[in-house]
Amino acid sequence: MYREGYGLHASCGILFNHESERRGENFVTRKITQWVAGFKNWAERQGLDTNPENFEFDDDNIYGNGESYPKLRLGNIEAFRDWGHAEDYVNAMWLMLQQRDPDDYVIATGETYSVRDFLIYAFKYINIEEEDYGKFFLVDSRFHRPSEVEYLRGLPNKAEKRLGWKREVSFE
């Protein structure tokens, strides 16, 4: 391998999805959280709380007090991902660099959640329950990836055992 050939102390971290407030807004997690925060702020400016009974819905928009807000548009909400937090993953990278011998590690949570699960948690954060959240978004085929991977999960066993690494931030 390259590191052995050149005598480099270089470890390789295979990092599964890791999220933070710095994540680009074109990623689904940020798209959802930005939309939810924007909707909550819009509703408050209308003098409304987020109770679905305060709104009317059509195919594309949500209406409250005569104003409209566009529904959240998403692609495949049945895709499962192994989502961790960036700070935890940076800690894993630091631990890799502290090792006497370089190695390759999978940095992941070992758990999967669907985009639908992420939506449910995000909407609950603004007091919209699971039975109502479907009114606020729509699945749009334009946002489907042409080569979507349905299920991604990493197994961090080696990193946990050899590095003593454990994620601190849960999905919730």
Which functions belong to the PLM regions below?
Residues 12-14:
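Conserved beta-strand scaffold in the Rossmann-like NAD(H)/NADP(H)-binding core
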Residues 23, 28-172:
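C-terminal substrate-binding subdomain of Rossmann-fold SDR/epimerase-dehydratase oxidoreductases
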